[in-house]
UniProtKB/Swiss-Prot annotation:
EC number(s) given by UniProt: 4.2.1.10
Disulphide-bridged cysteine pairs: none
Record key words, sorted: Lyase, Quinate metabolism
CDD domains assigned: DHQase_II
UniProt function note: Is involved in the catabolism of quinate. Allows the utilization of quinate as carbon source via the beta-ketoadipate pathway.
Family that this chain belongs to: Belongs to the type-II 3-dehydroquinase family.
Native source species: Botryotinia fuckeliana (strain B05.10)
Protein name stated in the entry: Catabolic 3-dehydroquinase
GO molecular function, one term: 3-dehydroquinate dehydratase activity
Gene3D superfamilies for this protein: Dehydroquinase, class II
Binding-site positions, substrate: N79, H85, D92, I106, S107, R116
Catalytically driven reaction(s): 3-dehydroquinate = 3-dehydroshikimate + H2O
Lineage: Eukaryota, Fungi, Dikarya, Ascomycota, Pezizomycotina
Amino acid sequence: MAVKKILLLNGPNLNLLGTREPHIYGYDTLASIESSLTTYLSSLTPSVTLLSFQTNWEGALIDRIHEARTDGTDAIVINPGAFTHYSIALRDALTGVDIPFVEVHISNVHKREEFRHKSFLSDKAEAVICGLGVYGYRAAVEWCVGYLKEKPKA
């Protein structure tokens, strides 16, 4: 059986997790979240692996999404950070590669400033998870594993 790949993407300022506004985002660092997800995923199934990428640059995020089209990525979990609210280019990249994706936000963006209520990605995502803290990443990965098991062979 071929190993499936889930690509975890994190956008701007998420490299500051653990120290940036911990009253909103918590005290877990991005490295600890990635490590925890890798451990959790291996407990769920040996046939799915997690790849991680974080950048503060919109173009780099788009380039990585394009790369996913040819590197065997089967599903994407993305916390686009502030790109959520204005990046049509990110939306176009995600829809252009035809890889299912889950949008994740640590905080409940709907309880925050008005400008955070609009997402350019939500209507194209398979699922949107927000307000569950870092557990949202785990829920997204678990959803992807279920999706990949149920996905018909091409």
